[in-house]
């Protein structure tokens, strides 16, 4: 009996070590965010602001102000909750009405763990909730060469409302469109279009750091990524302000440039495969 107790104890210790090792890369990024990240406020118009992170891996937050409260698009990290709230309060003292997740990656939605505890509603594509409910392997990101493990989220941090392809939310005179155009960056991306303000938050379906990350392990598609960019262009005009997942506020021309580069690369690669080139 003592032998079996010892065996169970050793097995449990080994499992704990493996779990800690799995999350080592995540904890490293989290620590860098805690120690280095600052926030910059970018005013888009009187009702809309972007919170742009500097010095750490985190996504841009969109902040829409209505008389009834604030709508956030993405919420960065739980570990910098105080910094996020301080930054939001410098924009507006209103309460947060609800949060929209653009996709499930940690640098955009880890803040769910902080805001979900407060009972703030969270809205996302249905696949975001599914993926947050389990541990996920992320790899191949251009900003790091290690495998990243994203642990499963507690129930209180999961989206409370989900949709499949499209959803409309009306806040006073603003029509907020949640649009999923199929697999792209992941299989659960949301393009958030604030129609009357003419502002789009694209999440990581559009970025400015260079060649985008397509999460093939979680339903992403390179061809689909190009399609999503085409769809963003289709709902935009010359006055549309486009918030990328990472980087400065952009316009339709920036999206077209990235789309053209990716389309060219895709066609070259496809031609190579058809000719059995390596």
Could you say what each language-model-derived stretch is?
Residues 8-16:
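Hydrophobic h-region of N-terminal signal peptides that target proteins for export
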Residues 67-71, 79-124:
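Active-site metal-binding motif and surrounding structural segment of the metallo-beta-lactamase
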Residues 47, 64, 74, 88, ...:
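Divalent metal-coordination and catalytic microenvironments
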Residues 1-9:
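Sec-dependent signal peptide recognition
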Residues 42-88, 192-204:
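Conserved beta-strand hairpin/beta-sheet module of binuclear metal-dependent hydrolase folds
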Residues 16-35:
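Sec-dependent signal peptide cleavage junction
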Residues 43, 69-70, 77-79, 129-260, ...:
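Metallo-beta-lactamase
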